[in-house]
């Protein structure tokens, strides 16, 4: 995921925005001119949020991180 890419967030919310900032723990997305921050917990809550970015097609972003005993792949 790179800054400037379009991202679609579905689940409890259904929005499309532009990725503004990406770090190991957060993603900031500009949606309708407002920056919204999503955390690692948001990515982990697969029942709440699913993240897609737009390139040639939509695909799900599953961050690969290790936090203590938590291993998300």
Positions of predicted regions on the chain:
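Conserved beta-strand residues within beta-sheet cores
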Residues: 4-6, 16, 58
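Short coil-to-beta transition motif at edge beta-strands of beta-rich domains
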Residues: 1-11
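Generic short N-terminal amphipathic or hydrophobic helices
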Residues: 6-8, 25, 60-61
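Secondary-structure boundary/capping motif
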Residues: 4, 28, 53-56
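Basic/aromatic-rich interaction segments and small domains that mediate binding to polyanionic partners
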Residues: 12-47
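Intrinsically disordered, low-complexity, charged/polar segments
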Residues: 34-73
């Amino acid at each position: 995921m790179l800054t400037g890419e379009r991202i679609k967030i579905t689940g409890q919310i259904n929005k499309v925005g532009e990725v503004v900032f990406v770090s190991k723990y957060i993603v900031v997305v500009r949606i309708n001119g407002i920056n919204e921050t999503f955390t690692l917990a948001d990515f982990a809550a697969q029942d709440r949020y699913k993240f897609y970015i737009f390139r040639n097609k939509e695909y799900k972003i599953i961050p690969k991180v290790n936090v203590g005993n938590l291993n998300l792949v």
